[in-house]
Amino acid sequence: MIIIEDDNILYEEPRIGFVPVNSNKTIEVYIHPNDGGNVPHFHVRKYSASGKGFEWETCIRFDSADYFLHGKYKDKLPNRKVAKELDKMLRTINTTDIRKRTYWLLAIDDWNANNSSVTVDRTTEQPDYSQ
């Protein structure tokens, strides 16, 4: 979990994982709790080299390989290599998960557990995010 302080309210952000899997942990996939817009999505961001802030941060829909740009999240993935690695990561089984879910299913479950207004069906197939 990541703890974010926003206007003196603490939020826990469920971390899905890093891109690529077993990487040096610079590109992170996570769920923002009680996220606005009523569009199920996950966040992807790259930490800056200095460790302070992010080089970019974007949101991607669960139901299609499209961005959900809203609020301060206006960036897009920087290149196709990152998109391919993201797609591959989400299709990979998380070996640290006791239930051995893919990162995709982990993301769906974390969205559903942390966003009550709209849920994602667990049988939703992962779109091709590699493009």
Where are these regions (language model features)?
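Metal-centered catalytic cores of metalloenzymes
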Residues: 1-131
